[in-house]
């Protein structure tokens, strides 16, 4: 089941660590909340910071009683270091302390982690909003028909693998790199998929399926793309197509020797007739 979040009293940011540079966005007006809610919010953010320092890639926390309960979580990308994960969560929670103190719901996405809190429980729910999209726009695929023979199958493969990888060191995280050789040329294809561990396997599958639908809408002509939903993500990166030498009429020395030998044998056979 998909839960669409009400964006009233909502703070949504894209933030950056290192090379990526994304502008922060505040989508709504600010309102003041009771001191009890603010205290619970600060407790949740502090708890998330502390657990990220322990090497966790995912954690959720709850503080307070209704109507001032605050729910929070973080999820780090499965292929970054534990130190990078902790640094990302620390930066996000500190930014929330500074920029979102008057909001009852907040998301922060970056290239390495996602951090959020809300006054409504979102645990175990599949959500398709808000979502972040990033993809190459000035570096489109020269021959998309060649890549499209491989990319959909690779994404389908990861969607099947991710829900069954809950017991791996980073639950629900899978990645793969493949060198693809076709008649037209060769290229490297890297892809990854990840779900939040609070989802059950079937919900993980549903979430990733929704992301694939977004890929087909936004990014089918892009060399790389990243789509993050609140509970799952997909990424891929395709190298430039490298033409095969044989497809350009170029032969290696070995091929040339083989060709001359074959011709000599055929001439000898014909002369013997």
Curated annotation (Swiss-Prot):
Question: Could you name the Gene Ontology cellular component terms for this entry?
Answer: extracellular region; plasma membrane
Annotated InterPro entries? GNK2 (IPR002902), GNK2_sf (IPR038408)
Q: Which residues form the Gnk2-homologous domain?
A: 22-122, 128-241
User: Where does it live in the cell?
Assistant: Secreted
Q: Name one Pfam family in it.
A: Stress-antifung
Q: Which gene encodes it?
A: CRRSP6
Question: This chain belongs to which protein, by name?
Answer: Probable cysteine-rich repeat secretory protein 6
Protein family according to the UniProt entry: Belongs to the cysteine-rich repeat secretory protein family.
Q: Where is the signal peptide?
A: 1-21
Keyword Glycoprotein assigned to the entry: answer is no
Query: From which domain of life does this come?
Result: Eukaryota
PROSITE patterns recorded: GNK2
Q: Which UniProt keywords apply?
A: Repeat, Secreted, Signal
